[in-house]
Amino acid sequence: MSDTSGPMDAPARAATPNPDLKVLDKLVGSWIASGDTDGTISYEWMEGGFFLVQHVDITLFGHRVKAIEMIGHLQPFGEQPSPDIRSRAYDNSGNTLDYVYEINGNELMIWGGEKGSPAYYKGQFSPDGNVNTGEWVYPDGGYKSTMTRVK
């Protein structure tokens, strides 16, 4: 008989989410997207508070885009959490897109791939936090986007 135990068999420990994830609370809720794109975007915390889940249903450049994104710290088996808040989005065209999230005050930065990438979103929250206006920038183009919270 062989021992097939692994990390999932370890006794449950009382893990708590990294406090830096709290900045993502600004995104929680349902939003209407407008500008060069239109549709709906929603964010909700996954049970446990380690990951923010984004649901996207928008039209961009005449194409419908549906996606789900998991946002939080990477933590492979046996390793420490990543220092950056990272995400991976999966869309209805088969793309997997990786990002790094930063929220400083009312500024939202989403880097495509790694920090400092030439592909990024830079947006500004209104003082009440119910509107985020910004622009996706990437080497061959970009687009303007406004998200308005509806609940």
Describe these PLM feature segments.
Residues M1-K151:
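Hydrophobic small-molecule pocket/channel-lining residues, especially in calycin-type beta-barrels
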